[in-house]
């Protein structure tokens, strides 16, 4: 089959990409949403979401499934479809995936982030055998008194610690500083439950035989290394941008590899927009949703040149 023509190709089906697809189609743009893995991005592996308006508390997977259901009423959504190549030919983008080739007028990149690794001995060896980056996926194996450590000090680490505690795991949080940077509400919940925190501490090595059975932890203040018996290690120390597509298109990025955008989500390349965690800053669902809608509306303005865009230009030139 020949190339598929679209107005807009959106890459990444997290909250930003799904919102962009809804807004794009509602604005009248022929849109396709491509996702190389499963729907939902980081939210899909978040045990509980408590700060998304309209839901006091909702499992992340449930929230993204609801978003996906709504998105599929408007836009084509292709899962397990990965962008392999993308190039600009005159005023169109040729997007090659493992399944098809698309020719599009505009591109929205909502490719998100992936988990940062500890980069310590034993981490890779025991991945899936005690080392995890997803409490929602793997927490069940450590219920009923199993000893686990959660490494990190942000919202994700605190959420993991609380979730594992509710499963009945014996949880210790390991943080390299003497202050957590997570929300106050999460700190209070951890204190209330008596979750132990090892301050000013880092994991030096993950030990085990067939599975994890211990970790070496260094106290940075005391300069002491001690071995602690554990069954599991959950890593939550931040994220790295999924910027492969941005690199292919030669987009301007910041020092950490996040895509630079203006307030309308436009990138350094005309007709290419970015939204969600890939733009850096505050990694929150509400922000991703907001940026997704703005990216789609900017794409609509640039592709369709509606009368109000011309009026705006006139006002600005006066």
Task: Pin down the residues of each PLM region.
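FAD-site-proximal beta/loop scaffold in flavoenzymes
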Residues: 1-3, 119, 125-142, 237-287, ...
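A Rossmann-like FAD-binding core segment of flavoenzymes
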Residues: 71-97, 101-104, 166-263, 303-318
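Phosphate-coordination loops involved in phosphoryl transfer and adenosine-cofactor binding
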Residues: 5-7, 80, 144-146, 200, ...
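Conserved phosphate-binding and hydrolysis motifs of nucleotide-dependent enzymes
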Residues: 12-17, 112, 152-154, 276
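Beta1-alpha1 glycine-rich phosphate/pyrophosphate-binding loop at the start
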Residues: 3-74, 156-183, 198
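Glycine/small-residue-rich loop that forms an oxyanion/phosphate-binding "nest" at active or ligand-binding sites
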Residues: 78-142, 153
């Amino acid at each position: 089959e020949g190339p598929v023509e679209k107005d807009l190709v959106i890459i990444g089906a997290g909250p930003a990409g799904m919102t962009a697809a809804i807004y794009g189609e509602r604005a009248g743009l022929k849109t396709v949403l491509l996702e190389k893995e499963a729907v939902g991005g980081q939210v899909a592996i978040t045990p509980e979401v408590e700060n998304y308006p309209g839901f006091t508390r909702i499992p992340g997977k449930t929230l993204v499934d609801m978003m996906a259901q709504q998105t599929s009423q408007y836009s084509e959504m292709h899962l397990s479809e990965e962008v392999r190549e993308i190039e600009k030919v005159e005023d169109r983008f040729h997007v090659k995936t493992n399944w098809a080739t698309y020719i599009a007028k505009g591109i929205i990149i909502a490719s998100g982030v992936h988990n940062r690794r500890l980069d310590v001995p034993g981490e890779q060896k025991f991945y899936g055998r005690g080392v995890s980056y997803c409490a929602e996926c793997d927490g069940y194996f450590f219920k009923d008194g199993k000893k686990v450590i959660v490494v990190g000090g942000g919202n994700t680490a605190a959420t993991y610690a609380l979730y594992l505690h509710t499963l009945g795991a014996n949880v210790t949080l390991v943080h390299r500083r003497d202050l957590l940077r997570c929300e106050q509400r999460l700190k209070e919940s951890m204190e209330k439950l008596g979750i132990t925190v090892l301050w000013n501490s880092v994991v030096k090595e993950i030990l085990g035989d067939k599975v994890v059975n211990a970790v070496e932890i260094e106290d940075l203040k005391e300069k002491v290394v001690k071995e602690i018996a554990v069954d599991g290690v959950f890593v939550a120390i931040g994220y790295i941008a999924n910027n492969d597509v941005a690199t292919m298109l030669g987009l301007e990025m910041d020092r950490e590899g996040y895509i630079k955008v203006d307030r309308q989500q436009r990138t350094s390349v005309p007709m290419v927009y970015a939204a969600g965690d890939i733009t850096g800053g505050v990694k929150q669902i509400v922000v991703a949703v907001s940026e997704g809608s703005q990216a789609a509306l900017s794409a609509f303005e640039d592709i369709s040149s509606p009368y109000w865009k011309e009026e705006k230009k006139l006002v600005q030139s006066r």
